[in-house]
């Protein structure tokens, strides 16, 4: 791949992974508009790893505190806000793992197309708008509870459908369940860690077994750009989301979905 192509695709991955606007909808645009071939399995692994490293490093203190508290809850039975949050994150991960294994082949075969992505981009954008407008509660992440965590986990499982947006679906569910905008975003970002780690392990195994030639320079550039873009995205999103709300992302999703439908008809 050309350097411009590497940087653009890595930027798209890094910026859209944590914004509620669907990364799959954006990754399909370069191929549609510029006629680019698929970037290859190894490049997907690299840019996803970059995004995962960004969220892990950004929330390193939270994750370390949660991990220690979780271990203490197992060893000594000590419960704290951090240990409960860790358990809720684990619980919220289960539906995506089950649904992902069960429906992976069906989704890849039948739902990974522009029509589905355009439709879900618009539909789930409208759901995000409704949830943001109707939500009046200000619960923190430590007030989530296991029932809400499980429901948010089902939303994450639904986001396996291309165009839905994992962050968009989980934030929508969290807002509907009474979490504040900032809490909904933080819970969504923390949820991405176990899912991302699991996916990274699986795809790395597939990559090792793949006969695909590996361009390590391209992978390094892609991972770095994706990491920087994702880190900046998380920082500014959490900084401004309480005041800004979800409306700008909803409008953007409606425009993006319309553009994708226009490309279908073109």
UniProtKB/Swiss-Prot annotation:
UniProt membrane topology term: Multi-pass membrane protein
Pfam families tied to this protein: BacA
Main location: membrane
Entry-linked InterPro entries: UppP
Keywords: Antibiotic resistance, Cell inner membrane, Cell membrane, Cell shape, Cell wall biogenesis/degradation, Hydrolase, Membrane, Peptidoglycan synthesis, Transmembrane, Transmembrane helix
Family: Belongs to the UppP family.
Purpose of the protein: Catalyzes the dephosphorylation of undecaprenyl diphosphate (UPP). Confers resistance to bacitracin.
Entry protein name: Undecaprenyl-diphosphatase
Gene this chain is encoded by: uppP
């Amino acid at each position: 791949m050309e350097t411009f192509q590497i940087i653009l695709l890595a930027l798209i991955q890094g910026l859209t992974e944590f914004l509620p606007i669907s990364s799959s909808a954006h990754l399909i645009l370069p191929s549609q508009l510029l006629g680019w071939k698929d970037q290859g399995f190894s490049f997907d692994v690299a840019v996803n790893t970059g995004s995962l490293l960004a969220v892990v490093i950004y929330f390193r203190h939270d994750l370390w505190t949660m991990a220690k508290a979780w271990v203490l809850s197992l060893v000594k039975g000590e419960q704290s806000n951090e240990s409960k949050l860790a358990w809720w994150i684990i619980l919220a991960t289960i539906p995506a793992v089950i649904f992902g294994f069960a429906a992976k082949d069906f989704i890849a075969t039948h739902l990974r197309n522009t029509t589905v992505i355009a439709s879900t981009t618009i539909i789930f954008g409208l759901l995000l708008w409704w949830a943001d407008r109707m939500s009046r509660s200000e619960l923190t992440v430590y007030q989530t509870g296991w029932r809400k965590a499980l429901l948010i986990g089902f939303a994450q499982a639904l986001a396996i459908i291309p165009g839905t947006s994992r962050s968009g679906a989980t934030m929508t569910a969290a807002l509907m369940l009474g979490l504040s905008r900032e809490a909904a975003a933080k819970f969504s970002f923390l949820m991405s860690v176990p899912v991302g780690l699991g996916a990274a392990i699986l795809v790395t195994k597939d990559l090792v077994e793949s006969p695909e030639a590996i361009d390590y320079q391209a992978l390094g550039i892609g991972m770095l750009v994706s990491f920087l873009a994702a880190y900046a995205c998380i920082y500014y999103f959490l900084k401004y989301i309480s005041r800004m709300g979800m409306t700008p992302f909803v409008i953007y999703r409606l425009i993006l979905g319309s553009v994708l439908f226009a490309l279908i008809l073109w």
